[in-house]
């Protein structure tokens, strides 16, 4: 699955171990990293040099739309993510603490849209972020010939398609 992404492939064990330590799905972590780093091609995946040292940020934590490389690298520096391993573990810790460990923001959809408090505490600004991430995850599961087990479906008042 990552054979054509050597930047991530050489850190497969780090993703697996970070996932285990933070009780996060490893397929999700890798998919999230692929999405946020443009399939591991961005500067944040390959290290951004600040003051003679490289910093990494695989999940786009702290990366603002105004200058995602600069702000993402500054966040990585502030948190000591000066190796890919530290960035993988640190990012997984951030995602777990600030999103997945909260019942109201533990899905891709709720991370992006925050239905309980729309417009506040959202992981991403891209309106297709949750869908794009879900598609990458679905492709991984399809290639592994398995299916996800747990789904949370949000149903809105005027959503005839999903009404019971």
Which residues does each PLM region occupy?
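Cell-wall polysaccharide-cleaving catalytic domain and substrate-binding groove, primarily
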Residues: 15, 35-67, 151, 161
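N-terminal export signals and maturation junctions of secreted/periplasmic proteins
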Residues: 1-14
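Structural motif
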Residues: 23-24, 81
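Non-catalytic cell-wall polysaccharide-engagement segments
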Residues: 59-164
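Solvent-exposed, polar/charged alpha-helical surfaces in well-ordered, non-transmembrane soluble domains
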Residues: 13-17, 30, 89, 93
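Short, functionally critical alpha-helical segments immediately adjacent to catalytic or ligand/cofactor-binding
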Residues: 24-40
């Amino acid at each position: 699955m990552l054979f054509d992404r050597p930047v991530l492939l050489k850190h497969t064990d780090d993703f697996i171990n970070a996932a285990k330590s933070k009780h996060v799905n490893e397929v999700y972590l890798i998919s999230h990293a692929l999405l946020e780093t443009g399939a591991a091609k961005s500067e944040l995946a390959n290290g951004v040099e600040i003051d003679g040292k490289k910093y990494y940020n695989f999940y786009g934590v702290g990366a603002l739309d105004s200058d995602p490389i600069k702000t993402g690298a500054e966040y990585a520096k502030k948190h000591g993510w000066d190796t890919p391993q530290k960035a993988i573990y640190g990012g997984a810790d951030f995602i777990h603490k600030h999103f997945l460990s909260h019942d109201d923001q533990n899905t891709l959809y709720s991370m992006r849209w925050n239905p309980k408090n729309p417009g506040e505490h959202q992981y991403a600004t891209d309106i297709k972020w949750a869908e794009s991430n879900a598609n990458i995850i679905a492709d991984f599961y399809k290639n592994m010939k398995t299916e996800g087990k747990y789904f949370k479906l949000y149903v809105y008042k005027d959503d005839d398609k999903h009404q019971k």
